[in-house]
Structure formats: C-alpha cells, structure tokens
C-alpha cells in the first residue's frame, strides 16, 4: 500500500540507508532507458533495475568482474495527481525511480498514481501539501529524505489558472497564480538545491508553458508566472552549476486534458489552427522529455535551457 502523508499531520517514516545517484562518469552500464512513449519509437518499457541487471550480467560474462550497483533515483513530483504531473510521475516510476507524489486537493487521484507506480514494481509516497507554503515544502522534502535518504530529482509541475482579461482581473486572481506557479517553484527549487549542494549533484526540471514565451489573451497572471519560471530557472542553473546541479525548463503548449475534451467543435478548430502539427500534445509527450532531462546520462551537459514541446506554436 502506498504511504500517504499530509503536511498538517506529518507521519514519521522509518529512515533507510542513504541512497544517491552515482556520478554520471561512473554510470557506464546505465544507458538511457527505453521509453513507452510512441514518439521515442519504442513500445516497450523497462524499469531501471531490469536494464541494469541485464547489462551487468553481460559485462560480468565478458570480463568476469562485478559491476557496481546503480541505486534508484529519488524523485519529488509536485502536482502529480493528474494530467502532465501524473504522466511524469508514472513515467519516472516505470523507469525505476522512488517517487513522492505531491497533491494539493486530489488525494484519491494521487493515491491511485502511487498504486500504479507500485504495480510497476516501484516505490511511492503520496504527500498532501501546498507548495506555495514554505512549511509544506519543508515537510515534503523531509518526508522524502526520511523515507529514502536523499533527493536526486525534483520536478516542479504544480500550477493553476485564473483566466480573465487584464482589465477585469482582480488582484486576488493575480496573487493566487503568482503564489503557486512562481513562488511555489522558488520554494521547492531552493529547498532541493540545499539538499543537492551537499552531495554535489542533482537535477531540477521546472514545468513552465509556451504562454510564458509568447503570451496569451486572458492569461496575464499565468504568462507572467511562467515567464518568471523561465528566468528564475536560468539563474538557478548558473548558481547550481558549480555543484553539478542541472536546472532546466519544459514549456508545453496545448496538451490534451479534461478541459480540452469539453471544448466545442468551433473552439477546438480555432485552437488546432494555431498549431503547425495540427493536434494536441499528450501528457506522455511531456513526460518523455522530462524523463530524459531527469535521468539520462546524455542530459548531463544540458542546463539552463527552456524546451518548448508545443507542436510548433512558438516557431
């Protein structure tokens, strides 16, 4: 059963032996994982432990020497109960990570995500907390460390929208979006960086939006927050680079969701007309890119970058 933790009632978890990423240069037996995402050209998915075991066996047979064990990365994913966050948590869980599934209100959905990760053979903790509140963020990071000894990757995905035209926007609508979408990223990145600096390694992926690059009518608050995430992440990448901490941004465009499913035919036609590829992206598309940035040795030299995954909107 997945462990559920709320920020207001933090459950004491038994500490386990401290885990951590191997240095990239040591992971010669850990190749990029095959993804279950169609756009990666593969329909087969393997957990990290399976990949490592198979490769270690091959090396041992050829050299007669044992290959050092690669530990499962510990990942915190915020806003992971549905949509893009859910897809990211499941993708990383399938890849063999130990995943803390954060949610704000959707406890049942978050618990289901954790159960799916465990069904893949992984480990998961469900944590309820508001990432715009410093105390909740500190409790969330402590929960992951108490359970698994470290944090290797943080994916800041939690976010909200409060859409309306600028001339009608209330200050409360502005503040609410900025607090969660920008301040929440600041708090989680700051907390994660303190942990990662001590061990001189880590990866942080912040989910922004193509709206932060090109703007959108009725989303002045959202656009400002997401543009802020991009600039903030570039600065965090510069400050963390000397400690081998990679910070990158993913900027999705229109991604299929419950909201897009409810759009009328005329509105959908108008939206798709703005996308060169002529279709919505899928949450799994975003998850595949995040998995690469979070886990692949090939991403070790990438930092401070903002990747659009938008079907060509921002060309």
Curated annotation (Swiss-Prot):
Belongs to the short-chain dehydrogenases/reductases (SDR) family. This is 3-oxoacyl-[acyl-carrier-protein] reductase 3, chloroplastic. InterPro entries: 3oxo_ACP_reduc, NAD(P)-bd_dom_sf, Sc_DH/Rdtase_CS, SDR, SDR_fam. Its main location: plastid. It catalyses: a (3R)-hydroxyacyl-[ACP] + NADP(+) = a 3-oxoacyl-[ACP] + NADPH + H(+). Pathway: Lipid metabolism; fatty acid biosynthesis. NADP(+) binds at residues 77-101. Homotetramer. The active site is at residue 222. It is found in: Plastid, Chloroplast; Plastid. One of its GO terms (cellular component) is chloroplast. CDD domains: BKR_SDR_c. One of its GO terms (biological process) is fatty acid biosynthetic process. The lineage of its organism: Eukaryota, Viridiplantae, Streptophyta, Embryophyta, Tracheophyta. Residues 1-55 form a transit peptide. SMART domains: PKS_KR (SM00822). Keywords: Chloroplast, Fatty acid biosynthesis, Fatty acid metabolism, Lipid biosynthesis, Lipid metabolism, NADP, Oxidoreductase, Plastid, Transit peptide.
């Amino acid at each position: 059963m997945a462990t559920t933790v709320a920020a207001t009632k933090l459950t004491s978890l038994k500490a386990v032996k401290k885990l951590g990423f191997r240095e990239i240069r040591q992971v010669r037996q850990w190749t990029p994982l095959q993804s279950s995402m169609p756009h990666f050209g593969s329909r087969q998915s393997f957990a990290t432990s399976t990949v490592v075991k198979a490769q270690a066996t091959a090396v041992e047979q050829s050299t007669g020497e044992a290959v050092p064990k690669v530990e499962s990365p510990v990942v915190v994913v915020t806003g992971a109960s549905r949509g893009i966050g859910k897809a990211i948590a499941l993708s990383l869980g399938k890849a063999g990570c130990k995943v803390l599934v954060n949610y704000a209100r959707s406890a049942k959905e978050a618990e289901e995500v954790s159960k799916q990760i465990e069904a893949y053979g992984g480990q998961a903790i469900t944590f309820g907390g508001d990432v715009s509140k410093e105390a909740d963020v500190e409790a969330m990071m402590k929960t992951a460390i108490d359970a698994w000894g470290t944090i290797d990757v943080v994916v800041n995905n939690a976010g909200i929208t409060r859409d309306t035209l600028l001339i009608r926007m209330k200050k409360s609508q502005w503040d609410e979006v900025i607090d969660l979408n920008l301040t929440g990223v600041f708090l989680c990145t700051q907390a994660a960086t303190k942990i990662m600096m001590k061990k001189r390694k880590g990866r942080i992926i912040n989910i922004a939006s193509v709206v932060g690059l090109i703007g959108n009518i009725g989303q002045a608050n959202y656009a400002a927050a997401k543009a802020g995430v991009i600039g903030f992440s570039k600065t965090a990448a510069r400050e963390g680079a000397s400690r081998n901490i990679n910070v990158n941004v993913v900027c999705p465009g229109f991604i299929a969701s419950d909201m897009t499913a409810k759009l009328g035919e005329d509105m959908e036609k108008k939206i798709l007309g703005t996308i060169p590829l002529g279709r919505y992206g899928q949450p799994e598309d975003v998850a595949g890119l995040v998995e690469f940035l979070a886990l692949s040795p090939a991403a070790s030299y990438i930092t401070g970058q903002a990747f659009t995954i938008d079907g060509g909107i921002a060309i």
